[in-house]
């Protein structure tokens, strides 16, 4: 990674965090693949001379999640649908909590790195892995997948289980690294 050593603060002021869901089941065509933006999140990247001296911590506020789009489905998502999805996430699935991450190791080389660490969702901690890419010009991108059931989270289902949110969700963060 070409980011100079230092401590960097990331969040909505210089980046975007997205959660992307898919759907499955016999009624899957009725639902939507969602893109959810996390409005309140923060991360600190401590960058050393080499990857072994680097660390990453982050936190995301579940209550700040907003559905920004939904692909597929029988009908387009209305603003009311989006509000109901948020209410379900906060009230029935995750609670109005924080999601936390703390790296345990960072490896790789060039413009790519693998960040491994402990992810805590709904009070349960499990290992997680994210791919970090230096996009150039001070831009970075982190991607990873989270299996909800690894954290005791039951993916949403409707129509007696005929429509389900896939257990695996995609996480994507893109940010501009501020000056150290």
Regions found by a protein language model. Give the residues of each.
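Low-complexity, acidic/polar, glycine-enriched regions of mature
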Residues: 1-180
């Amino acid at each position: 990674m070409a980011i100079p050593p230092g401590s960097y603060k990331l969040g909505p002021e210089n980046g975007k965090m997205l959660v992307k869901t898919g759907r499955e089941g016999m009624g899957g065509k009725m639902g939507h693949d969602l893109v959810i933006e996390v409005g309140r999140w923060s991360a600190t990247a401590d960058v050393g001379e080499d990857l072994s001296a680097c660390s990453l911590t982050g936190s995301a506020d579940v209550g700040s999640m907003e559905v920004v789009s939904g692909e597929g489905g029988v009908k387009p998502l209305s603003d009311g649908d989006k509000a109901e999805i948020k209410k379900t996430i906060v009230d029935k699935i995750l609670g109005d909590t924080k999601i936390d991450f703390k790296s345990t190791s960072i490896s790789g080389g060039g413009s790519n790195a693998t960040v491994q660490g402990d992810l805590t969702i709904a009070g349960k901690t499990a290992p997680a892995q994210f791919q970090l890419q230096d996009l150039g010009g001070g831009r970075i991108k982190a991607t990873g997948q989270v299996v909800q059931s690894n954290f005791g989270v039951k993916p949403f289902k409707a129509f007696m289980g005929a429509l389900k949110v896939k257990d695996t969700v995609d996480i994507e963060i893109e940010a501009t690294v501020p000056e150290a």
